[in-house]
From Swiss-Prot:
It comes from Candida albicans (strain SC5314 / ATCC MYA-2876) (Yeast). GO terms for biological process: protein insertion into mitochondrial inner membrane. Mitochondrial intermembrane chaperone that participates in the import and insertion of some multi-pass transmembrane proteins into the mitochondrial inner membrane. Also required for the transfer of beta-barrel precursors from the TOM complex to the sorting and assembly machinery (SAM complex) of the outer membrane. Acts as a chaperone-like protein that protects the hydrophobic precursors from aggregation and guide them through the mitochondrial intermembrane space. It is found in: Mitochondrion inner membrane. Its main location: mitochondrion. This is Mitochondrial import inner membrane translocase subunit TIM13. GO terms for cellular component: mitochondrial inner membrane; mitochondrial intermembrane space protein transporter complex.
C-alpha cells in the first residue's frame, strides 16, 4: 500500500510504478527468505556434522577395536587416527563438491 496518492506514482504512460510501492515488502520478503535459508543451512551443517561423527565413531571403532578393553593400544590409536583422517578428507571433498554445485545452481 502506497503512502502517497497513486496518481503521483504514475509514469508518463499512465502505468503505476509497482517497484516503488512493493519495494519495502519485497525487501522484507527477501530478508525473510535469506534468514530461512541461513537457518536451514546451519541446521543441515549441524546434522551433517553429527552424522559424520556418528559414522567415524561407528566405522572406525568397528575397524580398529577388535577386542574392547579399558585402554587403547598404540596400534588401535594409530588405526583410529588414520581412519578418522580418511573420513574427514572424504567429507571435505564431498562438501566442496556439494557447495560448488549449490553455488553453480544459484548463479544460473
Amino acid at each position: 500500500m502506497a503512502f502517497w496518492n497513486s496518481s503521483s506514482s504514475s509514469s508518463s504512460s499512465g502505468q503505476t510504478d509497482s517497484s516503488s510501492t512493493s519495494s519495502p515488502a519485497s525487501l522484507r520478503s527477501q530478508q525473510i527468505k535469506q534468514d530461512l535459508q541461513n537457518q536451514i543451512s546451519q541446521e543441515l551443517a549441524a546434522a551433517n556434522a553429527t552424522e559424520l561423527v556418528r559414522t567415524i565413531t561407528e566405522n572406525c571403532f568397528d575397524k580398529c577395536i577388535l577386542i574392547p578393553k579399558d585402554t587403547l593400544s598404540p596400534t588401535e590409536l594409530q588405526c583410529i587416527s588414520q581412519c578418522r583422517e580418511k573420513y574427514m578428507r572424504s567429507w571435505n571433498v564431498i562438501s566442496k563438491a556439494y557447495i560448488g554445485r549449490i553455488q553453480q545452481e544459484q548463479h544460473h
